[in-house]
Amino acid sequence: SSSAASDVYKRQVYGFEDMFCHTCEQYFSYPVDDNLSDEIAEGIQRHILRSWRACLSDPKDYEARSNAMWDSTLALNRIISRGKEEDWVTHGIEHALSAYTDIAHGAGLAVVHPHWMAYVYLVNDEVTARFARWAVDVWGVTPTGKTDRTVAEEGIDRYVDFLRRVGAPLTLSEAGVPDDPASLDKYADHAGEAGGSFVQIHRDDARAILEACKEPVSF
């Protein structure tokens, strides 16, 4: 049925978003000096995006699906966490959403992850530079004549636009999650001390990120 086909499509989107976010949770963390783990992470992210597009274009493409399985193995087996602090704030906040609603994990990540990025990317120059590097190396942003901030924002914009084009939710309401003040307080209390590498996310930070999730990220 069309409903079943639609559900299968959504599950693919959410699975790929979880893969992509897993690599970012390790990549967007200290240290940000030269290291092989980050180079591998960028390659995995680029390939996840290729597999994602291919699988959505043709769900029966065996080559694309086999690539996606390899993508997911390398995204989730923690090989790219070697030498990295790791972050996992986005997952911590999303788990709070999943604790109180029936939202799919990947759908929650699609909402929270870009908003976490918007919350932390300007914390200091080296973090902004990391987001700019990601924008160039993963999303193909042209950096010539631009500040790191501008490049970083273009990268986050491309990520959000990609999620929009594949049909992922960009806000809590689009994901069917209550976003009234009492609900946001409840999610933030559950997320609590979410940790983090670039920025230590405490309960009130989580609440601010969740508040921002009422609207799509834009600069």
Residue ranges and their predicted role:
Residues R11, V32, L36-E39, A175, ...:
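A short N-terminal beta->alpha junction/helix N-cap motif
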Residues E17:
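Gly/Ser-rich, acidic/histidine-flanked active-site/gating loops
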Residues Q26-D157:
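Active-site segments that bind and position negatively charged phosphate/pyrophosphate groups
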Residues F20:
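Conserved phosphate-interacting/catalytic interface
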Residues T23:
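Conserved core segment of the aminotransferase class I/II
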Residues A135-F219:
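C-terminal charged capping/lid subdomain of soluble metabolic enzymes
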Residues S1-A5, Y9:
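Single conserved hydrophobic/aromatic residue that forms the stacking wall/gate
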